[in-house]
Amino acid sequence: MAEKTKTIGIMGGGQLGLMIVEQAHLLGARTLCLDPAPDAPAFALSDGHIVAAYDDAAALEELCRRSDVVTYEFENVPGSVLIPLEKKYNIPQGFRPLYDSQDRLREKDNARANGLRTPLYAAVDDEASLRAALAEIGFPAVLKTRTLGYDGHGQLVLKGEADVPRALPMLSVPCILEAFVPFDFEASIVMVSDGERVIHFPIGRNVHRDGILDLCFVPAEGIDDGLRSRMAAAGERFMKSCRYRGILAIEFFIRDGEFYFNEMAPRPHNSGHYTIEGCTTNQFRELVRFLLGLSLIHISEPTRPY
């Protein structure tokens, strides 16, 4: 008797979801996507779709009910609706990676607690706590909103006392103040874990334009074999210590041969797009293999620069 074709449910229908759909179809799976936008990119290829908000509990339950396994390509699905679903349906990555990444303070606390070096930081809720944090951290520093920040949004660099008044309007929501790291460049690593084994793709050197990733270079110039090995080992230890499963990308600041945790994303990452053509397998395929219960593939370094 032929094995039943599995359906992968995807929370999110953006370009990352589209590429998950492509790899799922190549591996013989069906796909069902949920996204608020009726013209979401992934809908063009998915076998089915649901147009609904990410906080629509009934729609998310429908997605889970109609799927054999569920993943996400968008990290701001509310925990209030996802946590109950995790207890009833097959969401192997679970809510924990999302929860840890949805709040910058919680994210930094978690990184530090699990062995990654971070810049100095402090929670900021009002002008008094901002000034107390600045007294400890000093200038320059970066004030960030704790939630819903991306691609440089919700951030303000404070170079000196004259910048403090500009920061006050941001304090209408919880914030975090971080020491500014005069980094040489940013690098990222994409990993996939099945709960026992962790594989990682080659580390990329990232270049941003207007706060948005523009280029990723692999092999990463400025990262020698020793630094590369230390970064990969730290990333793998972190993933195992947190007991994360599925896919995880970590961005690091590189400064004088050392690396500092910046942020993480529990989904495919834009800096990992080169893996589609540059490696023996790619980040989307390995996520799908994990979701389908297939063994992860050994990854080789690119044979030429990407």
What residue ranges belong to the model's regions?
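A short beta-strand motif that forms the metal-chelation/ATP-contact edge
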Residues: 191, 258-268
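Internal nucleotide-binding/catalytic subdomain
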Residues: 154, 158-250, 254-256
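ATP-binding N-terminal substructure of ATP-dependent carboxylate-amine bond-forming enzymes
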Residues: 1-102, 106, 128
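Glycine-rich phosphate/pyrophosphate-binding beta-alpha loops
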Residues: 265-279
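Single conserved hydrophobic/aromatic residue that forms the stacking wall/gate
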Residues: 297-306
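A conserved helix-loop-beta module that forms one wall/lid of the active-site cleft
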Residues: 95-156
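Short acidic-hydrophobic, aromatic-tinged amphipathic segments that line or gate anion-handling sites
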Residues: 49-53, 122-125, 158-159
